[in-house]
Swiss-Prot record:
NCBIfam families listed in its UniProt record: PRK01749.1 (NF002485)
Bilayer-spanning residue ranges: 14-30, 49-64, 72-89, 145-163
Lineage summary: Bacteria, Pseudomonadati, Pseudomonadota, Gammaproteobacteria, Alteromonadales
Disulfide links within the chain: 40-43, 104-130
Protein family membership: Belongs to the DsbB family.
Cytoplasmic side: 1-13, 65-71, 164-175
GO molecular-function terms, A-Z: electron transfer activity; protein-disulfide reductase activity
The species this protein was found in: Shewanella sp. (strain MR-4)
Name of this protein: Disulfide bond formation protein B
UniProt keyword terms in alphabetical order: Cell inner membrane, Cell membrane, Chaperone, Disulfide bond, Electron transport, Membrane, Oxidoreductase, Redox-active center, Transmembrane, Transmembrane helix, Transport
Gene that this polypeptide is encoded by: dsbB
An individual GO BP term: protein folding
């Protein structure tokens, strides 16, 4: 077993994934509450995608020696990062090509059985407009930085997918 595979089978790798998602969520709340930047609906959906990555990291951390746990974590990681990238690209398009016919809604469209914007309004209630660009760093908007972040998550997943799916030296169907 290579060092890379051992790392993919360790809690440390999943802890790094979880920690990076926590850092992004903390940054989002810093922008919202300290810098007073209002999140739009697409921003809220991207927050949810980051929470999905956080959940995937927690799943992987529970028992990373077992292949089934790593596969479930990787599946959550892939779905959340792909969905987040799709949302970030759509937001970049809205900001770069504003149109009165293509706008985002004022309220998120969560399922009726899970109205996150009502349960957690301080984190999941949008208050901004999607076409606003209130912040840039090095000439790159927040939406464009999220494209970088979600792309980074997908590149990391591509690097880790083979070691994640590989078994250990122990003879077992699940390891």
């Amino acid at each position: 077993m290579t060092a890379f595979t051992r790392f993919a089978h360790s809690r440390a790798s999943w802890l790094i994934l979880t920690g990076s998602a926590i850092a992004l969520e903390a940054a989002a709340l810093y922008f919202q509450y300290v810098m007073k930047l209002d999140p739009c609906v697409m921003c809220i959906y991207q927050r949810l995608a980051v929470f999905g990555i956080l959940a995937a990291g927690l799943i992987g951390m529970t028992a990373p020696k077992y292949r089934i746990v790593r596969i479930l974590g990787a599946l959550g990681w892939a779905v959340s990062a792909t969905w987040g990238l799709k949302l970030a690209l759509a937001l970049v398009d809205m900001q770069n090509n504003p149109s009165p016919f293509s706008t985002c809604s004022f309220l998120p469209e969560f399922p009726a059985w899970m109205p996150l914007h009502e349960w957690f309004p301080s984190v999941m209630l949008p208050t901004g407009m999607c076409t606003d660009v209130p912040w840039q760093f090095m000439g790159v908007t927040m939406a464009e930085w999220m494209v970088v972040a979600f792309s980074g998550y997908l590149v990391a997943l591509l690097l880790f997918i083979v070691p994640i799916l590989s078994g250990s030296n122990k003879p077992s169907l699940y390891k």
